[in-house]
């Protein structure tokens, strides 16, 4: 009654091939149990055939579970948003899932299996490989089944401008520092480290003054929050040398957005004055001192809210108000020219027109203080030009946006207005994709998605910064932005004869790269990225 695996041999061979190539989050024990179910001897042939019918949905579910594709929870949570996508965008997404090289390789594997199975009992080899994979999980606490680097030396980086130091076994996290990474990267140790990280972050905050000094200088703060822009996207689009980057005074080269979705990213930015909370804590009330714009309002800064879209998709505007504390009325959008149509068919307005409207409005409020939050959507996946259903080329849209920002910066310089512009992208657009996610898919907040080009530029200074931007190469996040704002909040640097740029940018808060969505967490541990899906075990992120 031992009938072998028959056609299921091909099922497991495909899995082994995908595992070797690094495309699977393989679960050896579950697959071994499934294989045992298929091999278990059943005398009656009808029951044997019934088993195969039962195995089909089980095998499909297990295959899905072994991939990096979004799980049922993620699909259900995002289902209402997916339903709002235009039909053209949905077809575009489906087309991206088709990997013709992979299909060709699977076809070759099918022919090879059919040919060799005439003389070889393939089941014996398939069972042997499955047993070997399970033995591997028992013989070592951490291993990788795909070609990747080996574990690196244990290093921890402390806060401020301190250099990286080798950690000792008894290290404890110091408030303001990143927790030490000394233990082997097992699931238990990574969970413990993540809990330590969040516990330390809860105690971090930016302290704003109770009031401004009498000689404080009024200025405007403009925070530009760009959707779908990471350093990886900039490189893929060939725009690393765009003049915009040289226009900044300060550039963050390792700024972590902490998430790969718009709503959570905006909330994190609006709550920048406290340490990084977990994803769940984003949707719980925070201390009043965490809200960056509320801290500024207490010092006399008038709040403004701008968007180049309606903010309705995914309840973005609602999240910004309820969880980000931004209660200001949305700036009037009537009469703005439409530059693009969003992935849900709603208009995306011309950003230069929006910025010029802001500039005109602020000029009416001379000698006052304002803080404006501006959210931009032109780079989001699926946006297209009016009258064209196909997604507009990312490079064309990015080039246009960078040109517009550069032109706006030039106009600000000519105006002489005292303005601090802070650019913080929400997250990347996954332009290149990787082994875990196709291009445009952001369910998992990978390092290439969450490492974003944040920058700061001061306008109207008596002694402006000259030369190349000051690069901040330490791992940073929103707390560093809040710290820069509080260091400039009295506005005195706009009128100083000489600005101490080293003092302004040194000892900024550092934050370990931890990124989280509802069902996925990615951390950097001992120089390597690790991912945890749906509360399961940690595995190395495929490189």
Task: For every predicted segment, state its role.
Residues 143-385, 451, 478, 483-503:
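Active-site-proximal alpha/beta segments of enzymes that process anionic O-linked groups
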Residues 418, 424-465:
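Histidine-centered active-site microenvironments of extracellular/periplasmic hydrolases
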Residues 489, 493-543:
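Phosphate/adenylate-binding glycine loop and adjacent helical scaffold
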Residues 296-300, 408-417:
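A structural motif corresponding to the C-terminal end of an alpha-helix
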Residues 283-290, 391-401, 442-450, 462-485, ...:
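A short beta-strand-to-alpha-helix junction
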Residues 1-161, 165:
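Transmembrane and membrane-interface helices of multi-pass
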